[in-house]
Amino acid sequence: EEESMGKLLLTGVDGNLGQLAADVLLTLEPVENLIFCGYNEESLKKYAEKGVETHVTNFNNPDGLVEAFKGADALALISMPFVGAKRQNAHKNAVDAAKAAGVKQIIYTSLVNADDETNPSVEKKDHIYTEKYIKEVGLDYQFMRNSQYAEAMVTNYFTYAHMNAPLTNSQGDGLMAYISRKDCAKALAYALHEFHHKVWNINGLELMTISTFCAIGDVSTGNHVPFVNVTDEENYQIWDAMGVPRTTDGVFLKDSEAPFSS
């Protein structure tokens, strides 16, 4: 039984989440059970040196994906760092290739409440699409519905602290259970390591408003960053003024305080 088991494949090992998940996986599995894929050849080298099978993959282009995924039983698909039709297409390419390569299960990093279609955020639509598509092609799945990474919000907090300005956005008094990216990575690695058929909600312990988050930041750092609520449109204008592109296809400023799109 054991010998017929295929390998475990992790995509996106050159990204923040993927790198953390790769490190956990290496403590759980022998290297000969693993395949690591990434966009950036340089970042794959250290794993190849350890004896892990590695492949350079670009999900925007389906060429070569089936070959890269061959021999894997389970594949962890970390969602792409862009939004909209481009991301949906990239995810579709990866899922199609997994199916064609004989992969049995996809473990996909989705978003908390992805199945709640009453909240049609731009970010969420891609996750709804990908979850549905994985089911449609008939692959077994685990969905890791991750909450907002705490680290991203800490970066956001310091952006405003450095500008000596209030943290301004349209979150209002919305509640969020922030969670460390490290915990999400650990959950992903274990989901790949142990077979389940499940939708996981990967949440922080405590729901809090952004005001509470800022207050915790103030106590921890000695800064003073109050929260100011604005409309979505006003929020876009603030980011525009900082030179932040509105979409992930926009031009990112080098060394920007805000390395993301609005």
Where are these regions (language model features)?
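Short, Lys/Arg-enriched N-terminal segments with co-localized hydrophobic residues
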Residues: 1-5
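Oxidoreductase cofactor-interface core, primarily capturing Rossmann-like NAD(P)-dependent enzymes
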Residues: 6-44, 60-63, 70, 81-92, ...
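Rossmann-fold cofactor-recognition segment
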Residues: 48-61
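A short hydrophobic/small-residue beta-strand
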Residues: 54, 105-106
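N-terminal Rossmann-like NAD(P) cofactor-binding module of classical short-chain dehydrogenase/reductase
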Residues: 69, 73-76, 107
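A hydrophobic C-terminal alpha-helical subdomain
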Residues: 232-262
